[in-house]
Regions:
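Conserved loop->alpha-helix
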Residues: 1-219
Length: 219
């Protein structure tokens, strides 16, 4: 599990592409501290397993499913990527719950400055927007951000200068693809409330969680 607080921006050193997979080699420093082979590192919001370690970087395998559902396929040597190690049990929870399992890819539709703030508008499909709510959390390329506005085409986030400077947001331009992961809590609630047509409801498998119960509890 991750928190969406980027620890450093790494650089893609090499991409070895296979027929349906790839091996990324990434130059990094901070995320190498206490990292061992087999540990998880989020790369632009995608949970990858460290397969090799070097004094100044690491390698990770990327499978076919990940390439299809993310923007990693468009990376090249020299690309800047956001990096975060998996959260330790005694770590500070600075962002929100981030699984590192990307829901899909959005595209930056607009970037504008408002005094010191930088606004990013991202267009995304309905399968992603259904889980995006105003004032809720969303992960963009591994960055935990708060949704400021949402409509039928996409959503907007307002970022502070520190976030832009410490992530690869300062490299982003209109039209760029970005990895999106919506709040996992909303997905679980939807799953519990959705009728399961594939199997009969019995006392053993029928959920006791209802919409009315959630409303009573303040959701």
């Amino acid at each position: 599990m991750f928190t969406g607080i980027v620890e450093e921006v790494g650089t893609i050193r090499n991409i070895k592409r296979g027929q349906h997979s790839a091996v990324l080699t990434i130059q990094a420093k901070t995320v190498l501290e206490e990292t061992r082979i087999g540990d998880s590192i989020a790369v632009n919001g995608i949970c990858l397993t460290v397969t090799r370690l070097f004094p100044d970087g690491f390698s990770a395998d990327v499978m076919h499913e990940t390439l299809n559902r993310s923007s990693l396929a468009g990376l090249a040597a020299g690309s800047m990527v956001n990096l975060e190690r998996a959260m330790p049990a005694n770590g500070r929870f600075g962002g929100h719950i981030v699984a590192g399992h990307v829901d899909g890819v959005g595209h930056i539709a607009n970037i504008r400055r408002d005094d010191t703030a930088v606004w990013y508008t991202v267009h995304a499909g309905p399968e992603i927007l259904r889980y995006v709510v105003e004032k809720g959390s969303i992960t963009i390329d591994g960055i935990s951000l708060t949704v400021a506005a949402v409509d039928g085409e996409g959503f907007s986030v307002s970022t502070i200068p520190h976030t832009v400077a410490q992530t690869n947001l300062n490299q982003r331009r209109r039209g760029d693809p970005v990895n999106l992961e919506t709040d996992v809590v909303g997905k679980y609630i939807e799953k519990l409330l959705r009728p399961e047509e594939s199997k009969p409801h019995t006392p053993a498998n029928e959920s006791t969680l209802t919409k009315e119960m959630l409303l009573r509890c303040g959701f």
